[in-house]
A protein has these predicted regions:
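Interaction/scaffold regions that mediate signaling and macromolecular assembly across diverse proteins
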Residues: 22-234
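Cysteine-nucleophile amide-bond enzymes
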Residues: 18-20
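Sec-dependent N-terminal signal peptides
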Residues: 5-16
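N-terminal secretory signal peptides that target proteins for export/translocation
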Residues: 1-2
Length: 234
């Protein structure tokens, strides 16, 4: 009896994991087709294929985030959900010059997604689901459709690639001089580090770790921030 129970639970876990892996395939194809390697988004093309994006988001809405999912499954699910919703927000209003031209300048507060009986905004997903998971690298994976936002990856996150892809996106962002310019004496960095200070309690060590020149950032480094460009990332 116990062996049957263990087998059944194992089988259900495998099915759940397989579903979590495969659910993002259609989004992965959309990103492959409509996002450049540099993170520029072809919203006009996506608008013509909106039915595929809608079907993906509908599937996400109907998917129960299981307690037995690991952190990697949950992270990839919610990162993809955030990015898909952001893309659809732009597509529904395209052509538009900036995401801040939508919903009175604050589209992040609009409840545009329902999962598990809860209506969620982009702010809810970011601040109440993703940030509490304790991985500050999510800030370089979720995309706000703006020029100064960390470029969106042209592939979907999944349980197998999420850690490596978070690492890659973070490293790419930190070392792109459009977003961050780092030397020992002074560092001019993205406004993201100012807005989300609490997620980077040891910012000096974070910047030192991820800049590929291995420049030491410490208490002697003068920190300033780039202005944020809200122009559309197309």
């Amino acid at each position: 009896m116990m062996k049957k129970l263990i087998f059944s639970l194992t089988f259900l876990f495998i099915l759940s994991f397989a579903h979590a892996q495969n659910m993002h395939l259609s989004f992965n194809k959309l990103l492959n087709n409509y996002v450049s390697p540099e993170g520029k988004v072809n919203y006009a093309g996506l608008k013509k294929n909106k039915h595929t994006l809608d079907a993906y988001i509908d599937m996400l809405a109907k998917t129960k985030v299981m307690e037995n999912w690991g952190k990697s499954e949950k992270l990839s699910f919610w990162i993809n959900t955030y990015n898909a919703l952001t893309i659809r927000t732009i597509v529904e209003h395209f052509p538009v010059k900036s995401i801040k031209d939508i919903d009175g300048g604050d589209p992040w507060k609009v409840k545009r997604f329902t999962n598990g009986g809860k209506a969620l905004s982009l702010n809810d997903i970011e601040n109440n689901i993703l940030r509490p998971m304790g991985d500050s690298r999510i800030h370089f994976a979720i995309n706000c459709a703006a020029a100064s936002c960390p470029p969106i990856a042209n592939k979907a996150f999944d349980a197998e690639n999420v850690d490596a892809l978070l690492e890659k996106r973070t490293t790419h962002f930190i070392n792109d001089a459009y977003f961050n310019m780092i030397s020992h004496d002074r560092a001019k960095i993205s406004k993201i580090f100012d807005w989300y200070k609490s997620d980077f309690p040891n910012l000096d060590a974070f910047l030192t770790k991820y800049n590929t020149q291995h420049t030491i950032v410490d208490s002697k480094t003068a920190i300033s921030y780039f202005d944020y460009d809200w122009k559309l990332n197309d």
